[in-house]
């Protein structure tokens, strides 16, 4: 009986650590509605004042709006991403101009610890080490309970 409780405790700790990962970096993928041409790694076609504009490989921040089906793309502001993967219509805000996306596009979010920008100067190594120590401690505690 005590072994079952310890295993449940271990599973709960692992789940808590995994779900604590935050997502803010994202990549937008889509297809040109006119030519069906795709761009690698990503492409978005937006319409502003009747003109079709292509945005290829756009990275930025995702912000939830009051509408649960739309999000704001904010290139330089702080923001959070709703989840690791989602598909929705977006309202983009490059250069502080609202641009409505003409189609439903995919939003692929990257975990903050795996930022695609390659900037390692943020000092996230200490938080990663703290997370590893905490998870190792939780596993040790669960194993000790299992041995009792």
Curated annotation (Swiss-Prot):
Any single Gene Ontology cellular-component annotation: plasma membrane
Maturation and modification: The GPI-like-anchor contains a phosphoceramide group, rather than a phosphatidyl group.
Coiled coil: none
Disulfide linkage: none
Species: Dictyostelium discoideum
Keyword Signal: yes
Signal peptide: 1-20
GO molecular function: actin filament binding
Residues bearing a lipid moiety (GPI-like-anchor amidated aspartate): 125
Topological category with respect to the lipid bilayer: Lipid-anchor; GPI-anchor
Protein name: Ponticulin-like protein D
């Amino acid at each position: 009986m005590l072994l079952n409780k310890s295993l449940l405790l271990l599973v709960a700790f692992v789940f808590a650590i995994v779900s604590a990962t935050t997502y803010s970096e994202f990549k937008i993928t889509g297809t040109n509605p006119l030519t069906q041409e795709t761009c690698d790694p990503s492409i978005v076609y937006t319409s502003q004042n009747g003109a079709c504009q292509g945005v290829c490989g756009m990275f930025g921040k995702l912000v939830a709006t009051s509408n649960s089906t739309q999000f704001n793309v904010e290139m330089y502001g702080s923001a959070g991403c709703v989840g690791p993967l989602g598909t929705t219509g977006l309202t983009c805000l490059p250069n502080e101009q609202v641009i409505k996306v003409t189609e439903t596009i995919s939003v692929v979010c990257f975990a903050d610890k795996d930022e695609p920008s390659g900037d390692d100067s943020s000092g996230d190594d200490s938080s990663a080490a703290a997370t590893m120590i905490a998870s190792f401690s939780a596993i040790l505690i669960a194993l000790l309970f299992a041995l009792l």
